[in-house]
Amino acid sequence: MSDPQTHAGLIVPSVFYGLSEGSPAFAAVQALADQENVGHPLGPWFISDNLITFGHTRGFLADQHFVAAVLAARPTQAERSIAWRTHTLCWAAHSVASLPGDFVECGSYRGFSAEVLMHFTSGLPHRRFWLYDLFDPTGGPGEGSRLPDHSPALADQVRARFRAWDNVTVTQGKVPEVLAQAAPDRIAFLHIDMNNAEAEKGALEVLFERVSPGGLIIFDDYGWTGYRAQKEMADTFMQAHGLSILELPTGQGLVVKR
C-alpha cells in the first residue's frame, strides 16, 4: 500500500478479526469500510483492528515522527492495521524517557512493535531492549497460539532484524523460565503480549518488582473478549498490589507502577 505525501500521514487498512464472512456484522463493517477516505489519516473515520470511530482526529496518523518509525519497520497490512496500538507503545516509550530501567517485551513474534520503538526512540540510547518469545510454539501448556510466521527459523530472522542495534537482546524460550537466563534488574517499559494467562502471570511474578516507580506496563490482549483469562489474571495481580488497569479502546491495558 502506498502512502500519501509526508504531510498527510499513514494510511490504515480496514482489518477485523472474528467476523464470519457473510454475517450481518461483517456486511455492516464492510459497508462502513467502503466509504470514501476510510483509512486516510486526514479523514474522519478509523475502521480497523476491531475498532470503529468517527470524528476523532487520530493525530498520531499524521505525526511524521511516528509515521516514519512505522514505515521504517516495513509493516505488513496486518501491522498497519494495529497503528493505534503501536502508537500507544510509542507514547509509553516517550513517557518513561526520564525513568531508570530497560525495555522488555514478552511475546515479540516477528519483532515489528519492537523495531518501531527502536526507530521512534532513535535507537533507545543508554538502554537495552530485551525481547522474549518461543518463536516456534508447539501449543503446550503456558504457550500462546501458533501464528502464521511461527517457525524454527523465526528466532534467527528476528535477530537479523535487529542486527543494526547492539543494545537489543533476543532470547528464545518459554516465559517465565527463560527469564532466569537473562533479564534486566530495572525496567522502565514492560510490554506483555503472549496470548496466554499462565505465561503472562509468570512474567509479572518475575518482572513486576523490577519495574521502576512511574514505569509503564502494557498488556496487549487485556480488553479482548477472546482473552478474558488474561484480563482476570492481570486484574487480580494488580489489585493485590493496590493498582488498577486502564482498559483502552484498542483492547490494550495500561498500568502505571507506583
Q: What feature does the model see in each segment?
A:
Residues H7, L51-R80, C90, A97-R258:
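S-adenosylmethionine/decaboxylated-SAM
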Residues M1-W84, V96-L99:
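Rossmann-like AdoMet
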